[in-house]
Structure formats: structure tokens, C-alpha cells
Amino acid sequence: MTTSVKPKRKSLGTLAFSQAVNGYQLFNSSRELDIRSKVMLHANGDWGDLAPEDAETNNQVVRRSNGGRLHSVYKLQDNKTIWIISSGYGLTKDDMDLTQFSEQDYCNTVILFPEEY
């Protein structure tokens, strides 16, 4: 597990589960809790099974909080791998000039299986 800086947490924005992840956890509270625990790790700066250089890139994004991308990789209890990707980390709609960007351009987080990328 790759650890990171302990930043002041920012919002992960809107959470979206891919169709496959949503189906995987549907009607299975153990799987749902496992995935949600990984989202909390991601939110707290634990990047999971990332290479050290990728973890450092995430740490730099957290320190700057200016709209970068965070990527985490985790193994679930049944050994399936999920990715959690936050785009626009640290941005809020108040930071955006909505004449140039839409609200979808500020922070959002997607939980997906690698094969869905």
C-alpha cells in the first residue's frame, strides 16, 4: 500500500460508479462496504497499490489543490481490482468561470474496473 501526505481533505466532488461496479455491488452489502471503504482511503490520501512515482504525482496534486487528477488502485476482498479516479481535485464550481467551463468540469470521482477505462 502506498502512503501519502496527510493533506487537509478536499471534496472528491460528485461520485459516479461505472455500470459494472454498480452491478457488482448491487444487493451485496459486503461488496458495497468494501468499495466504499476504498473510496474513503482515496479521500484520505492512501493511494493503494500505486507505483511510488504515481503516488508522488498524486501527493503533488493534493498539495496544489488546483484541479489535478488523482488515481488510486485497490484490491477488493474477492481479489478484483478497482480504480478510483478524481478529476479536477480541489476545484469547486465557485473556482470556475462558467462562461468557459461547465459544472461538469469541476471535481468528480469515478469508481470503475480497469477493463472499463
Regions found by a protein language model. Give the residues of each.
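Low-complexity, charged, repeat-rich alpha-helical/coil interaction segments
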Residues: 1-3, 92-93
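Compact soluble domain cores
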Residues: 2-71
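Short, compact, well-ordered microdomains
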Residues: 66-117
